[in-house]
Swiss-Prot record:
Keywords: Lyase. It comes from the Bacteria. Belongs to the DapA family. The lineage of its organism: Bacteria, Bacillati, Actinomycetota, Actinomycetes, Kitasatosporales. It comes from Streptomyces coelicolor (strain ATCC BAA-471 / A3(2) / M145). Pathway: Carbohydrate acid metabolism; D-glucarate degradation; 2,5-dioxopentanoate from D-glucarate: step 2/2. This is Probable 5-dehydro-4-deoxyglucarate dehydratase 1. One of its GO terms (biological process) is D-glucarate catabolic process. It catalyses: 5-dehydro-4-deoxy-D-glucarate + H(+) = 2,5-dioxopentanoate + CO2 + H2O. GO terms for molecular function: 4-hydroxy-tetrahydrodipicolinate synthase activity; 5-dehydro-4-deoxyglucarate dehydratase activity.
Length: 316
């Protein structure tokens, strides 16, 4: 069942969906002051929503106390201007605990991450997410990826569940997504169910996802190059195909290819990008590792090229 307020704010977003990195100090501890700055700058740069403590925010590496502090800080810095959603994951009991912590911290919704490690059947997966959704009044977006892959029938069941308002796809199986969208549309006509492209660097595949009926996407690039992410989002929304393809060819494809050169770069390279832009958010926590120096140098060049493309587009 749809939560109208959140659905209305996300259906046609005014800007990219922002997944902030989590800031750490030199001792590896949480740096809330820098984190607040990161979130505040993102909202001011045009984010349509903040997804705190999710994959890019190293949800896996945060203690419950750190998680609650970050979500509360994101809510305070957003100050009601945009909705704030928080990650919730691990096994059912812990996911419920994180959901309740997010509610207490003032979050507007949840991104329900895949269960930790286990390979479950469809019935168990549906039950898990239903229990998470029942734990709080917060609307829930279910994250499909890795060990949480759904049949179209299971997504229909989830779409019928009170509190479950959408599906974020991090799998990249376009055939499956087409069948999921079709099944929900057929079985629940008129139901407003949200779909998100949640692949790393989702801009690279968003033209294909949009054609399937998946209009929303996450933007890790927004963390370190908001001007590029906003320009792409605007061009996509306005049907400016020339700008879309220019940014895909000149910025996003090179970035995706660089990201593929290291395990964990979907987070580590983004965090390096934030540091390159002048905000010291610290390093990633283990087991992730920092990008190689040569890759950071290449990232500098890619960002500079993207900025040139945006400036050229603005002058047209």
């Amino acid at each position: 069942m749809t939560s109208a307020p959140l659905a209305a704010r996300l259906t046609v977003p005014s800007g990219p969906l922002f997944f902030p990195v989590t800031a750490y100090g030199p001792d590896g501890g949480l740096d809330l002051d820098v984190y607040r700055t990161h979130v505040r700058r993102g909202v001011e740069a045009g984010a349509a929503a903040v997804f705190a403590c999710c994959g890019t925010g190293e949800f896996h590496a945060l203690t419950p106390e750190e998680f609650a502090a970050c979500v509360r800080a994101a809510v305070e810095e957003s100050a009601g201007r945009v909705p704030v959603l928080a990650g919730a994951g691990y096994g059912t009991a812990l996911a419920v605990r994180y959901a309740r912590l997010a509610e207490q911290a003032g979050a507007d919704g949840l991104l329900a991450m895949p269960p930790y490690l286990v390979l479950a059947g469809q019935e168990g997966l549906v039950r898990h997410y239903r229990e998470v959704a029942a734990a709080t009044p917060l609307p829930v977006i279910v994250y499909q990826r890795d060990n949480a892959v759904f049949t179209p029938e299971s997504v229909v069941e989830l779409a019928r569940t009170d509190g479950v308002v959408g599906l974020k796809d991090g799998l990249g199986d376009l055939d499956l997504m087409q069948r999921i969208v079709s099944a929900v549309r057929t079985e629940l006509p008129g139901e407003e169910f949200l779909y998100f492209n949640g692949l790393p660097t989702a801009e690279q595949t968003q033209l294909s996802y949009r054609a399937l009926g998946v209009p929303l996407y996450s933007s890790a690039v927004f963390c370190f190059a908001p001007e590029i992410a906003v320009a792409f989002h605007r061009a996509l929304r306005e049907g400016d195909d020339a700008t879309v393809h220019r940014l895909l060819d000149g910025f996003y494809r090179p970035f995706v290819e660089l990201r593929a050169r290291g395990r964990g770069y979907a987070v580590a390279l983004v965090k390096a990008g934030v540091r390159l832009r002048g905000l010291d958010v610290g390093e990633v926590r283990t087991p992730l590792q920092e990008p190689a120096e040569e890759h950071v140098k290449q990232l500098v060049q890619i960002i500079e090229r993207g900025q040139v493309l945006v400036e050229e587009g603005a002058g047209r």
